[in-house]
């Protein structure tokens, strides 16, 4: 991840506030594989019946960048999300929940990719 810009702050704020009762949002989590943009770590110590946890990897292309660049960033995001999912931090954090890996790529202000792996 890089510095926060408008749309990323919006997504991050929504993710953190909407899920805050059940998830501990960990942003820019330092793991052995680098940094995850958002890891919604389930609060299993309080809500032991939780079923889901989330990694969200965000990427940004400039408005003038080609579609090839968007696809390159998409592949990069997928690889990063997969790497983060294999770290001890994430494996411990998700417990028995199902981990959802989500990649989002913006081109300028337009969301061009939003997919669950």
Feature-to-residue mapping (PLM):
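Single conserved hydrophobic/aromatic residue that forms the stacking wall/gate
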Residues: 1-6, 10-11
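Active-site-proximal structural scaffolding
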Residues: 7, 31-32, 49, 70, ...
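A short, contiguous, amphipathic alpha-helix enriched in charged residues
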Residues: 12-18
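Conserved catalytic cores of phosphodiester-cleaving nucleases, focusing on short active-site segments
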Residues: 13, 36-40, 51-65, 84
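Active-site metal-binding core of divalent-cation-utilizing nuclease and nuclease-like domains
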Residues: 19-50
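C-terminal accessory domains/tails appended to large, multi-domain proteins
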Residues: 24, 48-53, 59, 67-68, ...
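Flexible loop/turn segments at secondary-structure boundaries
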Residues: 32-37, 45-47, 62-66, 109-113
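Nucleic-acid nuclease catalytic cores
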Residues: 69-115
């Amino acid at each position: 991840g890089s510095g926060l810009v408008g749309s990323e702050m919006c997504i991050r704020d929504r993710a953190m506030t909407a899920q805050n009762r059940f998830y501990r949002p960990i942003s820019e989590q330092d793991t052995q594989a680098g940094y995850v943009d958002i890891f919604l770590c389930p609060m299993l110590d309080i809500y032991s019946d939780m079923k889901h946890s989330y990694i969200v990897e965000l990427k940004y292309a400039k408005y003038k960048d080609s579609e090839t660049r968007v696809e390159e960033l998409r592949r990069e995001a997928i690889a990063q999300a997969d790497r983060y999912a294999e770290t001890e931090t994430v494996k411990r954090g998700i417990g028995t929940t199902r981990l959802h890996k989500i990649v989002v790529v913006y081109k300028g202000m337009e969301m061009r990719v939003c997919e669950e792996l």
